[in-house]
Each structure stands twice: as C-alpha cells, then as structure tokens.
C-alpha cells in the first residue's frame, strides 16, 4: 500500500471528521484523481518536442501520456483543429498516491527558493491546481537528457464540497502551503 494512502486512512480521516463534524465516514473528502498536463504551443512547428515531452511525462508518472489535440482553429496562432498541442496523464488509485508522495516530499523540496505552495489556487469546488515551471525538480528526469525546460500543471481533483475542505484535506496529507 502507498505510504500516503496509509496516512490518509489512518490519520487524515479522523482529523477531518473531528474538524468538520462529519457523521458518516463517506462524507470525508478524498482525492479522486490527479491530472498532469503539459501544454506545448511550440509543438505546432516541431512535433519532436511533443514526443520528448510525452516520454518525460511518462518517466515522471510511470504511465504513458496521452497526446492532446486542439479543439478549435485559431488563425493568429497558426493552429488548426485536431493538431497535437500537448500531452496529459490522469492518475488514480495507487499510482496517484505514489505520485503525490513524491511531489510533496521530494520534488517540491528541490524547487529553488521554495517557501511553500499558494493556498489560493483552489477552483471553488475543492480542487487544487499547481503550476510547476520546470520538469527538472523530479528525480526521474536527467538534466543531460532534456532538450528544453518545460513546465507542467498538476490538478488534484478531490471530492470536497468547497475550498476550505479541500485545503484541510491537502494540508493534513502534507502539502506544504505558504503561511
């Protein structure tokens, strides 16, 4: 069992039940999925960038990345509908907990001048989105093998009803929020 899942089941559930006075254990918010997205606008000119990004995302998550395509044509960006412009991975269950554990305890600690993540990046329904400026903070990525520094977005989807519950869930699980 993943370490973070064990922490959630044995510690976080009790803390949240006491904090929000939940009567039923199924009311306690939980993390449903983690979506990691890498948007690459420069993939319009060079498709090889997309292949390297997908392989790096696969190394980071342990799961094959899906290529995302443009939904609309935008003439000013020289973009046509259906052109590949990014890649994403959706993690659930064990892999999700393993990734979050590595993100919170290893990767975020490797960010330069890290003071904690913003507590304002919630969407109103208890979901949290975190932007990462470079993929080098993950230990799976070798500095010598990358051709370009790319950023990525990590969205943590929870079953929380509001931002307050979502923030409490992530805080108890070990997300390093700024004070």
From Swiss-Prot:
Domain of life: Bacteria
Ion transport in keyword set: no
Keyword RNA-binding: yes
GO CC, alphabetical: ribonucleoprotein complex; ribosome
The entry's keywords: Ribonucleoprotein, Ribosomal protein, RNA-binding, rRNA-binding, tRNA-binding
MF term (GO), any: rRNA binding
SS bond partners: none
Family designation: Belongs to the universal ribosomal protein uL5 family.
Quaternary state and interactors: Part of the 50S ribosomal subunit; part of the 5S rRNA/L5/L18/L25 subcomplex. Contacts the 5S rRNA and the P site tRNA. Forms a bridge to the 30S subunit in the 70S ribosome.
Matches recorded under PANTHER family: 60S RIBOSOMAL PROTEIN L11-RELATED (PTHR11994)
Protein's job: This is one of the proteins that bind and probably mediate the attachment of the 5S RNA into the large ribosomal subunit, where it forms part of the central protuberance. In the 70S ribosome it contacts protein S13 of the 30S subunit (bridge B1b), connecting the 2 subunits; this bridge is implicated in subunit movement. Contacts the P site tRNA; the 5S rRNA and some of its associated proteins might help stabilize positioning of ribosome-bound tRNAs.
Protein name: Large ribosomal subunit protein uL5
Organism per entry: Trichlorobacter lovleyi (strain ATCC BAA-1151 / DSM 17278 / SZ)
């Amino acid at each position: 069992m993943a370490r973070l899942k064990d922490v959630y089941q044995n510690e976080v559930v009790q803390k949240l039940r006491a904090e929000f006075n939940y009567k039923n254990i199924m009311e306690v918010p939980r993390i449903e999925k983690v979506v990691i997205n890498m948007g690459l606008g420069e993939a319009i000119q060079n498709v090889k960038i997309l292949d390297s990004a997908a392989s790096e995302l696969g190394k980071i998550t342990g799961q094959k990345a899906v290529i995302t395509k443009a939904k609309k044509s935008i003439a000013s960006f020289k973009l046509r509908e259906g052109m590949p412009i990014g890649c994403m991975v959706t993690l659930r269950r064990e892999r999700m907990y393993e990734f979050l554990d590595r993100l919170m305890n290893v990767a975020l600690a490797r960010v330069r001048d890290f003071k904690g993540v913003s507590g304002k990046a919630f969407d109103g329904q208890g979901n949290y989105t975190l932007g990462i400026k470079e993929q080098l903070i993950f230990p799976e990525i070798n500095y010598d093998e990358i051709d370009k520094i790319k950023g990525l977005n990590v969205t943590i989807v929870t079953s929380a009803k509001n931002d307050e519950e979502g923030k409490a869930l992530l805080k108890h699980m070990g997300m390093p929020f700024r004070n």
